[in-house]
């Protein structure tokens, strides 16, 4: 220490009113200050989570995705809004594509193909790739036309709920994702008398025989659905795909084949023969659908250059790169491309979707610092920052890494949140005595009508009143903060609300539009929502989550221009939204990866543990998938807790848009679905955590913030302190809800 060259050479100036200034004459060469000297010339990379995994690092020398050179080049990697980064990583490895819903993939590619042919006078038909595309497009349409009637038949015959178990096809499709392999393997097991989906010791020989039966008769139908079929099944395939009227239907041919191929020692299926035949036909069609989806997607790029076809959102463009697939662990149930039949029996219809599961995407977030450690590459230091990413009950937001630092809110900010309020004010109109329900309205048309009714109820006075609810609330706001945010369930709902305000009321409104779309007459692109205070609009309508983070809407005084937030609909994703089930699967998979089962014990059975892991993942999947997502219908506590925790975090984030600059905000919850019993003046029973997402969120937050007591272990005490710091103010908002 005495021999340092800077000893006794520091000049300290403490004559001013500020903190003393230290001037070091050797700062330019001091090794302790090397990092400080590099800051002005440091190279900074800025990337979105999707670009980090999908965009090639060009024009840099690396011919790979940015996440790989980041391991070699970066000293520090900062992931802001880490929970959103985690969600983006998940999406990169889980692709969901509706096929037969309105504007589904199948209709988009068919429309683009035929319009392209018409524009080019059918010139592509003279090209080899054009003919091949036409061939597979015809295969795809025929496969859909063959499978969909079998699935819709289950609806018309009432094959739902427990009744689906009497029809093997209904049982398999209700379990969750299925494929040609799934259907034909289940058929092989059923032919051998195996009814349970769990392998039992006394039936192990039957399972082996069923697998051998599958590989003997059905494997070629799945592995190469457009190749030469097995000799015994050639008549069935020819009948299914024939271009002329055949003497027998495909189901009749399938029944005949099954009758002549009953496994040795097994009884005749009897009354279930027709049921098994439908599964055989459905398995063949399913294998053809997944194969044609892949082939058509693969051919789209070359076809676009040939005929200038419209971009139909090629699903191959959304798939992770091979170098990342080599690193990311598989899903516990295995990586797969499968079909998902989501039934809506009330409306006698359903949607056939394609799911492509490629791995546990959030694993990358946990390993950004050592992604290439197995190759001897020391990765960057990683800083994950987020205000809502530590809640073990949440599937979408929780990052299972103990925080090392918590930045507390300033006292002024905490006071602003304590002064803020949540108001439950269900809106009523003639014909809506129980309150207007937007969430759960049922069907696109009914929900759009409910959005218009709700918007009207907020923007026009009640019978006998002089002012509307919106006018009353804005009149009580600060003069420079008299703007409101309307929160809807979707971009379409937000557009409907804004259009109604502008055309049917005196309220001026804009609605948030995704950046990839033209804004239109009343639209405001997402990247420009910070400009909302500079427009002449009083209200901005946005889909839930789109205005929750990333953009501040400030007035000329630098504080939030929005003082009132109106939730037109209850916090609830659409029934067919798969993001929540996939988040639960990923959260459970990550738990297993962070806490693996060690098989170093001589008595440990690694194979059995793997079977249990895969079975548990499939059980979770089948619990959530194959039926519309519904809060009140969830029976499993872990699913309800995850759902409620996710919605509470989203509410907290959106509320923050009105808190910028340490000013309070008023949040009005208008949908009767928030608390159905409280919304109905004739119902005297209180809402519970089973009927109201608000009550469930309040009770769950209280449970999380409860003091574990002095006898609790240190980890429990530490978690309590973290939860109090992160979620304590949300707990205050929920505890002080004004129920009206």
What role is predicted for each listed range?
Residues 1-12, 266-345, 349:
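Low-complexity, highly charged intrinsically disordered N-terminal segments
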Residues 1-40:
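Cysteine-cluster motifs in flexible loop/terminal segments that predominantly coordinate metals
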Residues 1-5, 10, 50-54, 85-89, ...:
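Conserved Walker A/P-loop ATP-binding site and its immediately adjacent core
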Residues 26-43, 47-294, 354-357, 362-363, ...:
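Signature of the SF2 helicase/ATPase Hel1-core->accessory helical subdomain module
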Residues 33-45, 503-542, 553-556:
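Conserved motor-coupling elements within RecA-like helicase/translocase cores
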Residues 373-378, 424-500:
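Conserved interdomain hinge at the start of the Helicase C-terminal
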Residues 483-521, 558-567, 572-576, 581-592:
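Extended, charge-rich low-complexity regions and/or helical-solenoid scaffolds
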Residues 502, 631-633, 646, 652, ...:
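The feature captures the C-terminal accessory region of ATP-dependent helicases
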